[in-house]
């Protein structure tokens, strides 16, 4: 898993892996670069975004597998938007708790030192998700 978003570096890693261990799978660790990684030979992605929006990540995988460029573009841009919402606070996993609650899935509260969004922040986030067609 390469958690970076530098696709030139990912391509270099892929060349090394393909030369040394062709049976080894290298995957991007960010859904924001899943399409690029797939085009460079990755067969999957380790995507934190899939914790909250698995349907979008699975749809992107299907579009990539089918070569549907228009759908790939649409979904990749949607994932980048979702990641922006997940990043409104420094720790994306903590925001994911609130995103899941907004979607109707109560997974409790984040453990300290992480914290939940304020009611205002949650309300604003819900509105952004609605306006984006994500809920």
Task: Please tell me what each predicted stretch does.
Residues 1-80, 86-87:
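Catalytic alpha/beta core domains of metabolic enzymes, predominantly
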Residues 38-43, 80-115:
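Conserved short secondary-structure transition element at the edge of the structured enzyme core
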Residues 105-135:
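Flexible C-terminal active-site loop/helix
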């Amino acid at each position: 898993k390469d958690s970076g978003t530098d696709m030139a570096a990912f391509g270099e890693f892929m060349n090394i892996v393909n030369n040394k261990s062709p049976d080894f799978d290298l995957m991007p660790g960010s859904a924001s670069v899943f399409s690029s990684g797939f085009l460079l030979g990755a067969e999957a992605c380790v995507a934190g975004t899939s914790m909250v929006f698995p349907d979008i990540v699975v749809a992107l995988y299907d579009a990539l597998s089918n070569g549907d460029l228009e759908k790939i573009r649409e979904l990749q841009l949607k994932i980048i938007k979702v990641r922006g919402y997940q990043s409104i606070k420094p720790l994306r996993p903590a925001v994911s708790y609130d995103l899941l609650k907004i979607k109707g899935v109560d997974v409790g509260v984040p453990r300290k030192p992480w914290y939940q969004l304020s009611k205002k922040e949650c309300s604003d986030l819900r509105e952004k998700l609605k306006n984006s067609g994500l809920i």
